[in-house]
Amino acid sequence: MYRSHVLVCGGTGCTSSGSQQIMETLKEEIKKAGLEKEVSVVQTGCHGLCALGPIMIVYPDASFYSMVKVEDIPEIVQEHLLKGRVVTRLLYQETVTPAGVKALIDTDFYKKQHRIALRNCGIINPEVIEEYIGTGGYAALGKVLTEMTPDD
């Protein structure tokens, strides 16, 4: 069981801004810090804030980092993942409040949205089909193949 999960956006906007390099560097720095058994790194689909990419979300505290650069990765690993101190200068500013960091879903951009196609973005690993199946993926296909007729 990992104590932290780092989600790196792999959507088109973030990829064009260098998220693949971010992910590679992040994995290297986590290994250097000896955290590979404590911190998982997962590439996700698009979160919808492409202009802020590359973006990264660190759980369990849901810290939302935006416009992350490769040069920022050692600081994120050392400060946030190793010492538990959020790197506030990299946080998406709308998530920063006097009471602390608010969840991304509570920001103006997200709070009126009802995600359908991307509802599992950041919840499941898109590269692990068992996680998709575990959230009901392919249930409609199963119903069509086992319960319905061509006339249905």
Q: Where does each model-flagged region fall?
A:
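Feature of Fe-S/electron-transfer and energy-metabolism proteins
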Residues: M1-D152
